[in-house]
Each structure stands twice: as C-alpha cells, then as structure tokens.
Amino acid sequence: MYIIVVYDVSVERVNRVKKFLRQHLHWVQNSVFEGEVTLAEFERIKAGIGELIDGDEDSVVIYKLRSMPKREVMGVEKNPIEDII
C-alpha cells in the first residue's frame, strides 16, 4: 500500500516525529511524508507515531492508497522522488 502522512505537531515534538518518519518514508515537504509500505510497516508507523504525539494537542492524518498515485507538483518540488530501476 502507498501512504501519505500529513501532520501538525507541537514544536516540542515535531523533530522527533520527523526523524521517526524519515526512517520509514520519503520526505516530500514540510509536515508531509509518503511511501510504499507493507501492512506490518504501516502498523509500526502508526504505533510509533502514537508513542510520539500528544493526542490532545497534535494531529496526524494518514491517507492509504493502493499504489503510488499520479501527482502534479505546482511550484518547486522540495524533495523529488527519484525512480530507481
């Protein structure tokens, strides 16, 4: 499955969340990560985020898709995804 993670996290926790997500997904732009994951990886990511955030203050949205969507970037692409063959 392909996931897109979008988050709005308190300044005190944002670097920990970003560092954690960089281990699993591709950084796209501020507060957005995406990537192909297995179901087990998806569950690990959800559990890891759950341990890092404060549910009363922070917000994380995870979009689950069947495969990498076609996307169109308007303006500067901050961190292009390179296709590796």
Swiss-Prot record:
One of its GO terms (molecular function) is metal ion binding. It comes from the Archaea. Its cofactor is Mg(2+). One of its GO terms (biological process) is defense response to virus. The keyword Metal-binding applies. Its EC number is 3.1.-.-. CRISPR (clustered regularly interspaced short palindromic repeat), is an adaptive immune system that provides protection against mobile genetic elements (viruses, transposable elements and conjugative plasmids). CRISPR clusters contain sequences complementary to antecedent mobile elements and target invading nucleic acids. CRISPR clusters are transcribed and processed into CRISPR RNA (crRNA). Functions as a ssRNA-specific endoribonuclease. Involved in the integration of spacer DNA into the CRISPR cassette. Belongs to the CRISPR-associated endoribonuclease Cas2 protein family. Homodimer, forms a heterotetramer with a Cas1 homodimer. This is CRISPR-associated endoribonuclease Cas2.
